[in-house]
Amino acid sequence: MTTSTEMLAETLPDTPTKHLCVADIMTTRVVTIEMDDRLILAKEIFDNVSFHHLLVVDNEQLSGILSHRDFLRALSPNIGTAAELIRDTETLQKRVHQVMTHNPFTIAPHCDINQATKLILDHDIGCLPVLDNNVIVGIITWKDLLNAYYVK
């Protein structure tokens, strides 16, 4: 099975891209969730949006990332079906901080997209929160980077 970061690495051009910075391609409409929110809230969000990463905050400061993959790993495949297990219902009552990725890699908006690509590939991650003076200003994903390399 090919991961998203492997796919990005396999499709990158051999020549450096035009000089774009993270701010040029990042998504600025970011959805956050609190560390102590329950996973049931994350489920409601993921069920109604097309993106796969929630930035986790504590007192408006980035604390982690909850990916859709992290969320699904915490649940059994029976969630939402007639065979839903008591364990699944209990799992949805867990707090976000119990499942999230702590201390995520981040990047600044002025950084070159090649730096972002290197971080994502080197650490096999799907996204980077974009921080400016410790304030969340956006998010950049491997799909954003792939589009930047090939969209003219």
Feature annotation, model-predicted:
Residues 1-152:
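Tandem CBS (Cystathionine beta-synthase) repeat/Bateman regulatory domains
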